[in-house]
Structure formats: C-alpha cells, structure tokens
Amino acid sequence: MVKFAVVVFPGTNCDFETVEAIKRAGGKAERVWYKDSIKDYDGVVIPGGFSYADYLRAGAIAARQRIMEEIRELAEEGRPILGICNGFQILTEAGLLPGALRPNKIPRFLCKWVHLKVVDVRTPFTYLYEEGEVVRMPIAHAEGNYYIDDPSKVRIVFQYSDEKGSITEEANPNGSVLNIAGVANMEGNILGMMPHPERASHYFLGSEDGLKVFKGMVEWVRS
C-alpha cells in the first residue's frame, strides 16, 4: 500500500483529518514529527495550522527546518508533495513553489466555504477532476492572498469562482492575483492550495469535492 507522510510542526492542527482523508482515498498515512525522517514515504502532505504560531510570517520558520531538505529531495525525485493552507505558505517560503502568500486584502481571518474552478487537470492531484469543474471547499486563513510577479512561472490549478465557474472579483475572498487558490510547479508534482480538501472529504462535512485530491495522488503513486 502506498504510504504518505503528514508532516507535523509545532502549531500544525489539521494533521489528523488529513491522515483520515488519505485513508478514505485508499492510501496509508502517518503523522511524522518534523524532526524525523520521511525518506521512506511515497509522498508528503504538509497540512494546515499555524506552525510556530505564524511568528515572523506564516510558514517562515517551518520552511527553514531540516525536514524541508528531505522534502526537496523527494520532490526532485518526482514524488507528490501537497501543501494545504499553512502547508502552501511553507512551500512558498521554502522556495519549492514560486510566489508568496500575503495578508488578505481585508486584513482579517477568513473562515468560509468557497467555490473553486479546476483549471489544470494534468497533475497527480487533479487528474480525476474534469477541466472546468466547479467544486466546493472551505478556506480558513489570514494570509492567503497569493502574489506572483509572473504567473507563467507556475501552473494555475484552482481559481476562486462563483458557483457557475465564472472568475469574478466578487468570488475572490482574499485578493489573490488572478483569483488563484492553488498552484503547481511546472513538473506538476508539487501542489500548494489555500482551500482545505481534507475538510471536504466526507458527506457529513458538507462536501466530498476535496476527496479527489487525495484519491488522485494515491492512485497516481500506485500506478
């Protein structure tokens, strides 16, 4: 069975539900403390939370821990790396994804459900979706305003949209450039996203739209 590491930093708080989402997707997952090794895992998820209490900047301290070098090595081998919310912030701070996550346009914490348009289905995390499919997931962040000088340096995977898939200013909750909610590296094996797919992975949570993210990466490794 394919096995994923769910990395836990001081302040991580979405690790248990991320493990459960991977299990529901048919994979095996283990919580791995950030001081331990992840070299024997098939892929890595950096879940949400407030690593190191967002001191300095969200993700800034976690991105400078030794485990990030192992994550970089796994990424270079082509293994899937997923960063969710704080995990996305950590990936940008570590230079594994271009761009930066800035404070929301309206400087406050946002916790709400949003609609997303699936733009790129050529990644391990999104190939089970249809291009242009509209999905529903929650966000919970204060620094989710994604900025990048040159959007051609990344693959835009998810965009904030209305329920019909229109990319509008009104549908953009945090001011992200081009309504970007998630991006991948050019190779497609590293994905960072601010919405929480693990919180949309079971019908009793209100949506199962996020489960395909985990099913995709599990089946991609298995194949």
UniProtKB/Swiss-Prot annotation:
Its main location: cytoplasm. Residues 4-223 form the Glutamine amidotransferase type-1 domain. One of its GO terms (biological process) is 'de novo' IMP biosynthetic process. Its EC number is 6.3.5.3, 3.5.1.2. Keywords: ATP-binding, Cytoplasm, Glutamine amidotransferase, Hydrolase, Ligase, Nucleotide-binding, Purine biosynthesis. Gene3D superfamilies: 3.40.50.880. Part of the phosphoribosylformylglycinamidine synthase complex involved in the purines biosynthetic pathway. Catalyzes the ATP-dependent conversion of formylglycinamide ribonucleotide (FGAR) and glutamine to yield formylglycinamidine ribonucleotide (FGAM) and glutamate. The FGAM synthase complex is composed of three subunits. PurQ produces an ammonia molecule by converting glutamine to glutamate. PurL transfers the ammonia molecule to FGAR to form FGAM in an ATP-dependent manner. NCBIfam families: FGAM_synth_I, PRK03619.1. Part of the FGAM synthase complex composed of 1 PurL, 1 PurQ and 2 PurS subunits. This is Phosphoribosylformylglycinamidine synthase subunit PurQ. It comes from Pyrococcus furiosus (strain ATCC 43587 / DSM 3638 / JCM 8422 / Vc1).
